């Protein structure tokens, strides 16, 4: 864990500081650098998980639950890896992932925030295209300095998570902008009937959409 943390900090600080003399800025002037908001504690949260998992047919219900849970787990892992690749970072920057959400420690730079914003938008467009409004990803972050990560003063570390939670809650309350709502209302569906599993209008095979068919097929292998 220590090595992973050191690797995470080594990959983050240079993006913020942009210096060559790190001995001067981080060690000799350590106290000053501890107060600089060099980091972003960032989180992504997939909402709609419970409804998605428990939207299953009566036949093979247990396998269906496992398949949908596994699918969401793998999806989050892929999302994390894709975002880290866009940021030119490694999984050393991943603090936690599980249960449809994750936490990452990133550099607090304009470039990082731009990448995060664009990725969140593109990800939710993809979610809408494949799952309509069933799944949505809300993201949030808090700017942090080294002292806050050390919980100095006491309570400052938990305050970071409260800030993130508030940002994510606000986004969940206002999921879509006007353009996305217009797109939803004007979309032409491929099919005319509802999938008997997820109730989404789509092109069906055996009364099931392609997503539900694929998950049903996968359930036999896990």
What are these regions (language model features)?
Residues 1-222:
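Regulatory and interdomain segments flanking nucleotide-handling catalytic cores
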